């Protein structure tokens, strides 16, 4: 059985943290991709890796995307040290990239 997120460890681009909201101990991170051409690979509910941490995209707009970070993930990863305007490494969902490649 194959399950979970597919993360390879290959950084596709960076993103800048534009906003951090705290809700019930979870964080909502609003990020802006450095390479705008890669926005086509951002899909709500798709996987994304931020600084090597596999997460799920919760919202995508023309200008930014958002992810939720639960307390357990904050406690165990480097994400708890992030601040607004920090740059983070981004690995996009490999399945989104493959589907895009083979459908075009």
Question: Regions from the language model: what does each represent?
Answer:
Residues 1-104:
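Conserved loop->alpha-helix
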